[in-house]
């Protein structure tokens, strides 16, 4: 805390470039232009991370202070200083944690990157010790069967909206994938593609069977030449454009809480409930680790086990209903509770 307080009081000295050397903004600019890890991110992730980091530049070091985080010396960037930035987003824990995550990545790169004199760009990674804000949010709302039915009733087979729903639900892929899928991906009843997310760092190619329900909707729908889904100008959707359009379709069906990503969650839950294993879920959804798949199989296993065992809670009551209550001191278990 002493280093943070000292940095707040330190006089400002800005070089002609407009960016203080060895300052927080200086390190971020270096990260954007020199980090292979940053360049390997997909365009959308780069954009989001840049926005998160740049949003810290104009944060005052303290309320009412004339100095800002952009000029904060790296040597004085402490855990406390980073947690101040985190806590300013505390009303939205996901945004607060995204700040910490992005700052960690910058310092992680900075401590490894050496300048011409052999010194690292950043003396340490204080963000590593900054904790995340605990949140009980489960993220995007997972669609219920009733919500899927309402969407289908509003958007009949043959519409772009219904085709979008089918592609999302029956492939289990992200919007960044389904906006790029087209007939060129189809062969012998299967669809083959490389997932868009992570394609630069860890490309994942999937081959999925096309279930009959999806094939029927594709055959009955207006499709573009390069992609199944096209916008009103008959061009492939951008990711953001599709997100906005799908939001409109959900609103038209009265589904204010539903989103495209929520269908991916619903698909994983449905598959797990129907008995899909961790490995099977990883194969469908393209997850490289079992973390997400285990989340869904644990939930499905809990429901199945409870279903098979719940009758045991009533075993004594059922027995006494058939033979009469057992006479014992103090009455039956159910009398006591």
Question: What spans do the regions from the language model cover?
Answer:
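Short, polar N-cap/turn motifs at the start of nucleic acid-interacting alpha helices
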Residues: 184-190, 256-257, 276-295, 325-332, ...
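C-terminal catalytic core of Y-nucleophile DNA break-rejoin enzymes
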Residues: 198-219, 225-248
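C-terminal secondary-structure termini that scaffold catalytic or DNA-interacting sites
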Residues: 199, 232-233, 291, 310-337
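Conserved tyrosine-mediated DNA breakage-rejoining catalytic core shared by Y-recombinases
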Residues: 129-131, 135, 141, 145-149, ...
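Catalytic-site neighborhood detector that most strongly recognizes the C-terminal catalytic loop/helix
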Residues: 38, 142, 195-199, 278, ...
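Basic/aromatic-enriched alpha-helical hairpins
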Residues: 9-12, 29-93, 106-109
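Basic, Lys/Arg- and aromatic-enriched nucleic-acid-binding interface segment
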Residues: 93, 97-101, 112, 122-175, ...
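Short, basic (Lys/Arg/His-rich) helix/loop patches that form interaction surfaces
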Residues: 153-161, 171, 223-227, 234-235, ...
């Amino acid at each position: 805390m002493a280093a943070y307080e000292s940095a707040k009081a330190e006089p400002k000295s800005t070089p002609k470039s407009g960016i203080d050397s060895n300052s927080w903004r200086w390190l971020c600019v270096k990260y954007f232009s020199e980090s292979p890890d940053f360049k390997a991110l997909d365009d959308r992730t780069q954009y989001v991370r840049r926005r998160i980091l740049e949003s810290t530049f104009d944060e005052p070091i303290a309320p009412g202070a004339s100095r800002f985080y952009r000029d904060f010396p790296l040597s004085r960037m402490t855990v406390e200083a980073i947690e101040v930035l985190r806590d300013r987003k505390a009303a939205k824990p996901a945004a607060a944690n995204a700040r910490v995550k992005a700052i960690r990545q910058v310092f992680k790169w900075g401590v490894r990157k050496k300048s011409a004199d052999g010194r690292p760009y950043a003396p340490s990674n204080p963000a590593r010790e900054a904790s995340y804000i605990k949140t009980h949010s489960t993220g995007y709302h997972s669609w219920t069967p009733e919500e899927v039915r309402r969407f289908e009733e509003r958007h009949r087979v043959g519409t772009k909206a219904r085709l979008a729903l089918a592609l999302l639900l029956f492939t289990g892929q992200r919007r960044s994938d389904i906006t790029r899928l087209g007939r060129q991906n189809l062969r012998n009843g299967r669809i083959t593609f490389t997932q868009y997310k992570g394609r630069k760092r860890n490309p994942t190619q999937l081959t999925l069977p096309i279930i009959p329900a999806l094939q029927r909707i594709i055959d009955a729908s207006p499709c573009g030449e390069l992609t199944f889904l096209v916008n009103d100008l008959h061009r492939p959707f951008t990711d953001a454009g599709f997100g906005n359009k799908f939001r409109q379709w959900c609103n038209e069906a009265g589904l204010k809480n539903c989103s495209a990503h929520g269908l991916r969650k619903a698909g994983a839950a449905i598959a797990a409930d129907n008995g899909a294993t961790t490995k099977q879920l990883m194969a469908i959804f393209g997850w490289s680790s079992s973390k997400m798949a285990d989340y869904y199989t644990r939930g499905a296993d809990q429901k199945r086990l409870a279903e098979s065992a719940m009758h045991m809670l009533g075993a004594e009551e059922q027995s006494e209903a058939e033979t009469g209550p057992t006479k014992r001191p103090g009455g039956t278990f159910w009398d006591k509770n």
